[in-house]
């Protein structure tokens, strides 16, 4: 599973690069917003990425869940922190929230193996 997820992350980055070539101004602006929103500030970057995972779970965006889970892990978020955030998804999103929350936890475990 880890190889498959890493392949998907590579593909996500490739697709973003292709979109950046097709729409350089829009993607440059988007990447600037993403960088500004997720850098350390009053909240550490790891917490911001956990929030992004929670929002991706609520939106049902599987690639977003994978991407932001990998970023949370990169910023040293713990499994316990992710699980707490995912509990809020379950509270607010019911069954669909639980389904995508379980994916986020599985992605974290696989990428952290």
Swiss-Prot record:
Lineage: Bacteria, Pseudomonadati, Pseudomonadota, Betaproteobacteria, Burkholderiales
Membrane-crossing residue ranges in chain numbering: none
Top-rank taxon: Bacteria
Name used for this protein in its record: Uncharacterized protein H16_B0147
GO molecular function: peroxiredoxin activity
Family: To H.influenzae HI_1053 and P.denitrificans COX locus Uncharacterized protein 4.
Organism the protein comes from: Cupriavidus necator (strain ATCC 17699 / DSM 428 / KCTC 22496 / NCIMB 10442 / H16 / Stanier 337) (Ralstonia eutropha)
InterPro entries: AhpD-like (IPR029032), AhpD_core (IPR004675), CMD-like (IPR003779)
